[in-house]
């Protein structure tokens, strides 16, 4: 790590991650190089190696940042005092993930590459953040569905988080994939990230619908 203030180090890391995120909006993971990322920063390409050893580490840091933003949304959701029905909860959860398309894309398409080519310390930092995301979802469930047992919350998490790995490819197929489905005569439903998440969460929480209060 280069000498300098912690603030400068963090600012440069953020600039590198920002450049990576911008490129990922229009280019594929395998097509992006550290040279491409460096061309979008205010310092030399070789300086990037002071902060990240591989491009996969940069992408892993981007994925970690996306999870941190999601956690912030989940924590805000849990703090609200208004009760939520399963329908309301499902819609709120779907909204938080609709804003995290980059997160869903990275973890569904490039996770093994990122983790395999990153140093253990970087991977551990990401896994800690991933664990915090699971805890944040659990807190939301405990807040709005107090009747759920610890086992039921755990079962929701172990169904929900694996489900998230398939959301992006299903919601955002490539043009080539669409054409192949059409040529194969397979009907492809058009569903958004929000729609997919909402339907899944609602189905999982239907059993915990509170009965209407007696008059």
Where would I find each of the regions flagged by the language model?
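C-terminal peripheral helix-coil segments that are non-catalytic and often amphipathic
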Residues: 135-147, 163-215
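Helix-turn-helix
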Residues: 15, 23, 30-57, 61
């Amino acid at each position: 790590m280069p000498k300098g203030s912690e603030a400068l180090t963090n600012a440069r890391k953020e600039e590198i991650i920002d450049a990576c995120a911008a490129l990922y909006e229009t280019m594929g993971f395998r097509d992006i190089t550290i040279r491409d990322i460096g061309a979008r920063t205010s310092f030399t390409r070789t300086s990037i190696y002071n902060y990240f050893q591989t491009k996969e580490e940069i992408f892993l840091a981007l994925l970690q940042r996306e999870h941190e933003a999601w956690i912030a949304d989940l924590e805000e959701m849990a703090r609200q005092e208004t009760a939520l029905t399963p329908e309301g909860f499902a819609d709120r959860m779907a909204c938080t993930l609709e804003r995290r398309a980059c997160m869903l894309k990275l973890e569904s398409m490039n996770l093994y590459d990122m983790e395999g080519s990153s140093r253990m310390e970087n991977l551990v930092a990401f896994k800690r953040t991933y664990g915090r995301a699971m805890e944040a979802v659990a807190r939301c469930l405990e807040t709005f569905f107090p009747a759920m047992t610890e086992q039921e919350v755990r079962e929701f998490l172990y169904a929900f988080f694996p489900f998230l790995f398939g959301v992006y490819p299903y919601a955002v197929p490539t043009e080539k994939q669409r054409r192949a489905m059409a040529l194969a005569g397979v009907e492809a439903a058009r569903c958004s990230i929000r729609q997919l998440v909402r339907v899944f969460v609602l189905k999982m929480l239907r059993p915990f619908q509170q009965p209407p209060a007696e008059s």
